[in-house]
Amino acid sequence: VRFGVSISPELIEQFDELLTRRGYTNRSEAIRDLIRKELVEQEEIEGREMVGTLTIIYDHHVRELSEELIRFQHDHHMHVLSSLHIHLDHDNCLEIIVVRGAGPKIKHLADRILATKGVKHGRMVITSTGGDLPK
């Protein structure tokens, strides 16, 4: 389907600059990606099943933190699909936890981990499972 959109010259100029920086070869693919992004955000709001990664940095010397993180993952095994643990240096570890479940539920799980004493920094990225997204 083709459709037209009216956009100010200033806005389209900024949009084209963004597309160039991101490596898009045409506006159509960028617009499709923007639409998909909005659809994914709507899925999350509606509580549909989502997947995500929680990436955290923590000090493994904090008493019982490693055990607490492992226990939390086992307690929520129905949502935790996998985890990857990396030793960054003598004190700090990076852990990537892959989760799946209703958007609000996995966000809540991430918030609980991020609030754990000893977790220095973290970020949750949630996206669609892809099943409901058109090409």
Language-model segment annotations:
Residues 78-86, 111, 115-130:
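Conserved short beta-strand edge segments in small beta-sheet-based binding/regulatory domains
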Residues 5-7, 15, 25-36:
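Short amphipathic alpha-helical segments
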Residues 31, 40-47:
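Short, charge-rich, low-complexity interaction segments located
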Residues 61-62, 99-106:
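Helix N-cap motif at beta-to-alpha junctions
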Residues 67-72, 108-116:
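Short amphipathic alpha-helices in soluble, non-transmembrane regions
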Residues 60-80:
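Short amphipathic alpha-helix segments
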Residues 96-100, 132-135:
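Short, low-order "capping/linker" segments at domain edges
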Residues 48-60, 94-96:
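Short glycine-/aliphatic-rich beta-strand segments at the starts of folded cytosolic domains
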